[in-house]
Amino acid sequence: MRADEIEGVLAFLRAAERLKTVMRSGWTSEGQQESVAEHTWRLCLMAMLLYGHTPGIDLARLLKMCLIHDLGEAIGGDVPAPAQKAGVSKADQERSDLVQLIAPLPPALRREIIELWDEYEAAGSPEAKVAKGLDKLETILQHNQGKNPANFDYAFNLDYGQRYTAADPIMSALRERLDAETARRARDEAIPRRRADLD
């Protein structure tokens, strides 16, 4: 790698550092808002632990997709699924932001990242389908585990990302357990609110 390419990689890494402070809609079990970087870390951990249960998956490709799937949010931030507006393409904006973010990288790395992101977004390969499904499951897991605000909408998660988790047996099994946790959490959180309304 040439000196100018090394500088480009460093410039990209400095810009990508923003993901450590871009907040998501989930909260940690300690009551702190989760960052995009934290979500990506656990998504990669899930991919590493579960990829062997889906035949024909290339782990390196799967992990790369998991690492880059939210990179564009370093520029545009995270837009939670319930807050997305009809007629506005989150994917188009994220891709545009991603292109801007990776501009300092050498051409071959830019091409690889864009190709991986496009494949992920289209769910166009076994790896992309697993990455998409695990992305949804990690989000639900965090919502179930976190200390969320009092008005948190757990019911939304019962339908969230179903099409990405239904076809794979291991993801379906995880989904079944997470949905049961979600329903229990929604019920348990609603009881104190109803009591407060009666007071």
PLM feature segments, named:
Residues 1-199:
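Alpha-helical, largely C-terminal catalytic domains
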